[in-house]
């Protein structure tokens, strides 16, 4: 059996989709449980079949899926897993989405557009999820899209600990890639010894996806070792451009830090050649450092395991952030 037992009753069960089984195994190791066996396969027409190999009746179930490419396939697989647990009489179902899909579509920019991030929350609820866990949502308002508890976890302590251990904080300047993430940059600056801040002002094209048409630095980065942060990096165009702007403004060096390394082509080429000393990310999405000498991948598994344990024990997830959630 793979469940963790409490008071002679089967309780905690961890389930993994096929997108990133390595992360689920790492979380399971932290929790001292096994990932519950599941049969999953694709039919010839692209439909997905899932079935769990053990009883889930009365269990506290946690369904982990990383939404990497092909994103829509893995999203559908997680929804089917949740539906199967609901129909199998699971007591409580928590959907764990380390990287929340469609998070950038959290509002209408123009008429006749969907609010896709809200739809994802509705789909999770309809499938049978009682709770959602995610890491560093693109915008905080996504927490309100789901009609139930949402645990919004933060990777900042993991990333800042790496900075503290590997860089001299005396000359650090924390840089936000845009004005919208200045609040997050302030938290980073406080954590890194009240470091000075700057941000990159950018103008994004409304017609061409992932294209920045202009940007400039607001703040003094001359001679500074800059930590350029963001929640996610997709094609890397914005961040690579920001590195260039910081270097032109006199930055001594630039380190890039992000929670979600989407890294769609040609991100690897751009970030390898942009002049950044290091690109730091986590494994909320599957990563490979092969052929990418300046990429560092930190594990999110301990954070997810502690979160799962607090939920399972009916504890306080907020305590993981010393009162900041």
Curated annotation (Swiss-Prot):
Major localisation: cytoplasm
Organism (species): Corynebacterium glutamicum (strain ATCC 13032 / DSM 20300 / JCM 1318 / BCRC 11384 / CCUG 27702 / LMG 3730 / NBRC 12168 / NCIMB 10025 / NRRL B-2784 / 534)
Enzyme Commission code(s) on record: 2.7.6.1
Cofactor(s) in the UniProt record: Mg(2+)
Enzyme's top EC category: transferase
Protein's GO biological process: 5-phosphoribose 1-diphosphate biosynthetic process; purine nucleotide biosynthetic process; ribonucleoside monophosphate biosynthetic process
Lineage, uppermost ranks: Bacteria, Bacillati, Actinomycetota, Actinomycetes, Mycobacteriales
UniProt-listed PROSITE patterns: PRPP_SYNTHASE
Protein name: Ribose-phosphate pyrophosphokinase
